[in-house]
Protein backbone atom coordinates (compact mmCIF):
# COMPACT_ATOMS: atom_id res chain seq x y z
CA UNK A 1 0.00 0.00 0.00
CA UNK A 2 1.41 3.36 -0.94
CA UNK A 3 1.81 6.30 1.39
CA UNK A 4 -0.80 8.46 -0.34
CA UNK A 5 -3.52 5.84 0.01
CA UNK A 6 -3.06 5.89 3.79
CA UNK A 7 -3.64 9.64 3.98
CA UNK A 8 -7.06 11.23 3.88
CA UNK A 9 -7.81 13.67 1.03
CA UNK A 10 -7.44 17.36 1.89
CA UNK A 11 -10.68 19.36 1.87
CA UNK A 12 -10.87 22.82 3.44
CA UNK A 13 -13.00 22.81 6.58
CA UNK A 14 -15.16 25.77 5.57
CA UNK A 15 -15.85 24.22 2.16
CA UNK A 16 -16.81 20.91 3.77
CA UNK A 17 -19.16 22.67 6.20
CA UNK A 18 -20.89 24.55 3.36
CA UNK A 19 -21.39 21.35 1.34
CA UNK A 20 -22.73 19.39 4.32
CA UNK A 21 -25.14 22.23 5.13
CA UNK A 22 -26.48 22.31 1.55
CA UNK A 23 -26.78 18.51 1.49
CA UNK A 24 -28.86 18.55 4.69
CA UNK A 25 -31.17 21.22 3.24
CA UNK A 26 -31.20 19.47 -0.18
CA UNK A 27 -30.44 22.79 -1.89
CA UNK A 28 -28.26 23.53 -4.89
CA UNK A 29 -26.54 26.91 -4.93
CA UNK A 30 -23.13 28.18 -5.99
CA UNK A 31 -20.43 27.73 -3.35
CA UNK A 32 -17.62 30.31 -3.58
CA UNK A 33 -14.14 29.14 -2.54
CA UNK A 34 -10.51 30.16 -2.76
CA UNK A 35 -9.33 26.65 -1.85
CA UNK A 36 -7.83 25.35 -5.10
CA UNK A 37 -5.95 22.61 -3.26
CA UNK A 38 -9.05 20.84 -1.96
CA UNK A 39 -9.71 17.36 -3.32
CA UNK A 40 -13.09 16.61 -4.88
CA UNK A 41 -14.91 13.97 -2.82
CA UNK A 42 -18.15 12.10 -3.64
CA UNK A 43 -20.43 14.31 -1.48
CA UNK A 44 -19.56 17.26 -3.78
CA UNK A 45 -21.14 15.63 -6.86
CA UNK A 46 -24.00 17.70 -8.26
CA UNK A 47 -22.91 20.98 -6.68
CA UNK A 48 -21.62 24.05 -8.50
CA UNK A 49 -18.44 25.42 -6.93
CA UNK A 50 -16.99 28.80 -7.95
CA UNK A 51 -13.20 28.38 -7.86
CA UNK A 52 -10.92 31.42 -7.70
CA UNK A 53 -8.37 31.63 -10.51
CA UNK A 54 -6.50 34.66 -9.18
CA UNK A 55 -8.79 37.22 -10.78
CA UNK A 56 -12.37 35.95 -10.60
CA UNK A 57 -14.42 32.95 -9.49
CA UNK A 58 -15.17 30.40 -12.23
CA UNK A 59 -18.29 28.27 -11.63
CA UNK A 60 -17.57 24.56 -12.13
CA UNK A 61 -20.30 21.88 -12.00
CA UNK A 62 -18.92 18.82 -10.19
CA UNK A 63 -19.52 15.49 -11.96
CA UNK A 64 -18.67 11.95 -10.88
CA UNK A 65 -15.58 11.63 -13.10
CA UNK A 66 -13.96 14.59 -11.29
CA UNK A 67 -13.73 12.73 -7.95
CA UNK A 68 -10.14 12.46 -6.74
CA UNK A 69 -8.91 15.53 -8.62
CA UNK A 70 -8.11 18.92 -7.10
CA UNK A 71 -10.44 21.89 -7.57
CA UNK A 72 -7.61 24.00 -9.02
CA UNK A 73 -7.25 21.65 -12.00
CA UNK A 74 -10.52 22.92 -13.43
CA UNK A 75 -9.87 26.68 -13.12
CA UNK A 76 -7.01 27.79 -15.37
CA UNK A 77 -4.94 30.67 -14.03
CA UNK A 78 -3.16 31.72 -17.23
CA UNK A 79 -4.60 32.94 -20.52
CA UNK A 80 -2.29 32.14 -23.43
CA UNK A 81 -3.03 34.59 -26.23
CA UNK A 82 -0.69 33.12 -28.82
CA UNK A 83 2.63 34.24 -30.20
CA UNK A 84 2.92 37.53 -31.98
CA UNK A 85 2.79 37.05 -35.78
CA UNK A 86 5.49 39.54 -36.80
CA UNK A 87 7.97 38.77 -34.04
CA UNK A 88 11.32 38.54 -35.85
CA UNK A 89 13.38 40.13 -33.07
CA UNK A 90 14.93 36.82 -31.99
CA UNK A 91 16.03 35.89 -35.55
CA UNK A 92 19.22 37.92 -35.77
Swiss-Prot record:
It is found in: Plastid. One of its GO terms (biological process) is translation. It comes from the Eukaryota. GO terms for cellular component: mitochondrial small ribosomal subunit; plastid. GO terms for molecular function: rRNA binding; structural constituent of ribosome. Protein S19 forms a complex with S13 that binds strongly to the 16S ribosomal RNA. This is Small ribosomal subunit protein uS19c. The gene is rps19.
